[in-house]
Amino acid sequence: MADAAVGKEKCGDQRLVSLPLSRIRVIMKSSPEVSSINQEALVLTAKATELFVQYLATCSYRHGSGKAKKALTYSDLASTAEDSETLQFLADILPKKILASKYLKMLKEKREEEEDNEDDGSDLGEALA
């Protein structure tokens, strides 16, 4: 009976968590270190995830440009992840968007720079020989 009440308040059908527990369980089981998942741990992980998402959204909304429009955008989330020391670990997951043409130009410049470095290294090797 106690397991049936997990994830729901005792005095009603209002759930303690909004995220689907089955999805959280699948994500947790995808880790090779996890062999079994306790129901209480599952509910606590789901609640912690909700609180984290709420914190990220609140910080992004407060510091983002979407406040004037009363909207939260991807760029607000990416900026918050990059600027906040606490959320810095998300910078790789939430990169700032750039145009494909800019990205291709950056790749080309990087490739040319690497080729120049290789050419400089081969000249040095020939001079020593």
Swiss-Prot record:
<dbReference type="GO" id="GO:0003887">
    <property type="term" value="F:DNA-directed DNA polymerase activity"/>
</dbReference>
<keyword id="KW-0548">Nucleotidyltransferase</keyword>
<dbReference type="GO" id="GO:0046982">
    <property type="term" value="F:protein heterodimerization activity"/>
</dbReference>
<keyword id="KW-0175">Coiled coil</keyword>
<keyword id="KW-0238">DNA-binding</keyword>
<dbReference type="GO" id="GO:0005721">
    <property type="term" value="C:pericentric heterochromatin"/>
</dbReference>
<dbReference type="GO" id="GO:0008623">
    <property type="term" value="C:CHRAC"/>
</dbReference>
<dbReference type="Pfam" id="PF00808">
    <property type="entry name" value="CBFD_NFYB_HMF"/>
</dbReference>
<feature type="modified residue" description="N6-acetyllysine">
    <location>
        <position position="102"/>
    </location>
</feature>
<keyword id="KW-0007">Acetylation</keyword>
<keyword id="KW-0239">DNA-directed DNA polymerase</keyword>
<dbReference type="GO" id="GO:0006275">
    <property type="term" value="P:regulation of DNA replication"/>
</dbReference>
<feature type="compositionally biased region" description="Acidic residues">
    <location>
        <begin position="112"/>
        <end position="123"/>
    </location>
</feature>
<keyword id="KW-0539">Nucleus</keyword>
<comment type="function">
    <text>Forms a complex with DNA polymerase epsilon subunit POLE3 and binds naked DNA, which is then incorporated into chromatin, aided by the nucleosome remodeling activity of ISWI/SNF2H and ACF1. Does not enhance nucleosome sliding activity of the ACF-5 ISWI chromatin remodeling complex.</text>
</comment>
<protein>
    <recommendedName>
        <fullName>Chromatin accessibility complex protein 1</fullName>
    </recommendedName>
</protein>
<dbReference type="GO" id="GO:0003677">
    <property type="term" value="F:DNA binding"/>
</dbReference>
<comment type="subunit">
    <text>Heterodimer with POLE3; binds to DNA. Component of the CHRAC ISWI chromatin remodeling complex at least composed of SMARCA5/SNF2H, BAZ1A/ACF1, CHRAC1 and POLE3; the complex preferentially binds DNA through the CHRAC1-POLE3 heterodimer and possesses ATP-dependent nucleosome-remodeling activity. Within the complex, the heterodimer with POLE3 interacts with SMARCA5/SNF2H; the interaction is direct and enhances nucleosome sliding activity by the SMARCA5/SNF2H and BAZ1A/ACF1 interaction. Within the complex, the heterodimer with POLE3 interacts with BAZ1A/ACF1; the interactions are direct.</text>
</comment>
<feature type="region of interest" description="Disordered">
    <location>
        <begin position="109"/>
        <end position="129"/>
    </location>
</feature>
<dbReference type="GO" id="GO:0006338">
    <property type="term" value="P:chromatin remodeling"/>
</dbReference>
<keyword id="KW-0597">Phosphoprotein</keyword>
<dbReference type="InterPro" id="IPR003958">
    <property type="entry name" value="CBFA_NFYB_domain"/>
</dbReference>
<feature type="modified residue" description="Phosphoserine">
    <location>
        <position position="122"/>
    </location>
</feature>
<dbReference type="GO" id="GO:0006334">
    <property type="term" value="P:nucleosome assembly"/>
</dbReference>
<keyword id="KW-0808">Transferase</keyword>
<dbReference type="InterPro" id="IPR009072">
    <property type="entry name" value="Histone-fold"/>
</dbReference>
<dbReference type="InterPro" id="IPR050568">
    <property type="entry name" value="Transcr_DNA_Rep_Reg"/>
</dbReference>
<feature type="modified residue" description="N-acetylalanine">
    <location>
        <position position="2"/>
    </location>
</feature>
<feature type="coiled-coil region">
    <location>
        <begin position="104"/>
        <end position="120"/>
    </location>
</feature>
